[in-house]
Amino acid sequence: MGTYALPDAFGHYGPYGGRFVAETLIPALEELERAYQEAQRDPEFRAELHSELRQFVGRPNPLYHAGRLSRELGGAQIYLKREDLNHTGAHKINNAVGQALLARRMGKKRVIAETGAGQHGVATATVATRYGMECLVYMGEEDIQRQSSNVFRMRLLGAQVTAVSSGTRTLKDALNEALRDWVTNVESTFYVIGTVAGPHPYPVMVRDFHRVIGDEARAQCLELTGRLPDCLIACVGGGSNAIGLFYPFIEDRAVRMIGVEAGGLGLGTGQHAAPLTTGRPGVLHGNRTYLMEDEDGQILPTHSISAGLDYPGVGPEHAYLKDTGRAEYVAATDEEALAAFHRLCRTEGIIPALESAHALAHAFRLAPTMRSDQTIIVNLSGRGDKDIHTVAALEGIHL
């Protein structure tokens, strides 16, 4: 692969990415790109971002050796990158802080966001309150039912939560509504996209704000083990936690990178959210990437036990990493994720998010095939408090 320097000036990762949006949004995206590039060159902006990540988010978080789990599985040593310990309980806050600082720098008084599991909505509401901005979060009706505690948290933090009743009433539809809002209110409003999808410059901007995950993990692994990890594993919905972990390792060819999509009820059932594993290239939400679509190019409905993975597309950089073979993409089913959720609870005393449990499920498959002197880093992208009611209901327990 040589030196990795993507995206290009037009936001392309090979044939993926780009800026497929209404003409009315082009000036806003160009303004955003200029502001972001200026901020990246500004030592004061970088210093404030670093300070906020330390003092407000609580970084660096640990790279934790799951010793009991590793012994029980046999094979590779499993290390967990503890994004669940961040303020607000997931990786999402890294990007929300970065984009909110950028919004403030651009003089925007109102921020909007889309959310699936609610974690990005909570993170955006949190930073909007911190920096004194009005906040509106779009969320699909089905996700509002699945993640009612996060909806209440957003409202506690002062955000307005708007239910989206169109389409599948999930993340895809929330994103559509947020884009419509932005087109209408582009002068006053900053759209805080929560994943590495969307039109350029969002995929590169969100990646850069999340690369702190991989930068920390790389240094921590060298400190703890004296060498780089053999394998990185992260769940992939839109793909922000995964690209945050993977990006600093892309040129380290000996390090395997594996993204785990939502296998739902099984890849053969059509009831899943695995565009990289089963989909094909197309255009959605302003960028070209792998999608779940039918023969006519219509987006197919998705299913996952996890609201945060329930999305028919994926970030364009993941599409490129798949095609070049630098990263591998697999799927874990609802059932496998639930089993992994329980196993981590009972071996390490950590309750993971159902999204993260998909990554754990694949790590549990892979570790026994490796040697005990090899290491796997799993990105524990979030904590599972938000999923307690979902898991209890599936097991017939009424909370």
Curated annotation (Swiss-Prot):
GO cellular component, one term: cytoplasm
Cofactor: pyridoxal 5'-phosphate
PANTHER family in the cross-refs: TRYPTOPHAN SYNTHASE, TRYPTOPHAN SYNTHASE-RELATED
Species this protein is from: Acidithiobacillus ferrooxidans (strain ATCC 23270 / DSM 14882 / CIP 104768 / NCIMB 8455)
Reaction it catalyzes: (1S,2R)-1-C-(indol-3-yl)glycerol 3-phosphate + L-serine = D-glyceraldehyde 3-phosphate + L-tryptophan + H2O
Superkingdom of the organism of origin: Bacteria
Gene that this polypeptide is encoded by: trpB
Family, similarity comment: Belongs to the TrpB family.
Record's subunit section: Tetramer of two alpha and two beta chains.
Name by which UniProt lists this protein: Tryptophan synthase beta chain
